[in-house]
Amino acid sequence: MKIIYPAVFHKENNQYWVEFPDLEGCHTYGESLEETLFYAKEALELYAATLLENGEKLIPPTNISSIATDENSFATLIYGDIDNYLSSGKAVKKTLTIPEWVNQIGIEHNINFSQTLTDAILHQYMR
């Protein structure tokens, strides 16, 4: 299944981070623009595959021309193909322990813990 969603790239302190306005909690970062583009595609694919595997639906993407950016950001379209993720098996449940204060920050900022852990593992693996 091919998907295309708009993403907003932000530059801060010579690093980049990216968010998908239509996909709450779907974001990643990189040391360079090239690395961030790679991780953006991966984050989009993993996020979309996880939604579908959980029986949820993808919302239609926003028209990129309606996305506002500032001088340190830009919007672009990210293409993804989630067939490989969907055929690679179901998500597995993991039990882990994190400091209570980290958990509280995550809850307060609506951080998707599963997505964050997945992103972190893939980020370490790709290095």
Region annotations inferred by a language model:
Residues 2-4, 45-109, 115-123, 127:
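Short, charged, surface-exposed hinge/linker loops at domain edges
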Residues 32-49:
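A short, charged, amphipathic alpha-helix used as a generic interaction element across diverse proteins
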Residues 24-34:
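A short, exposed loop/beta-hairpin motif centered on an aromatic-Gly-Thr core
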Residues 1-14, 19, 105:
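N-terminal segment of the canonical double-stranded RNA-binding domain
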Residues 21-24, 99:
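Short, proline-centered helix/strand-breaking motifs
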Residues 32, 112-113:
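Residues that mark the N-terminal boundary/hinge immediately upstream of a DNA-recognition element
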Residues 21, 31, 108:
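Surface loops and adjacent helix of pleckstrin homology
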Residues 23, 41, 110:
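ATP/adenylate-binding site constellation spanning eukaryotic-like Ser/Thr protein kinases
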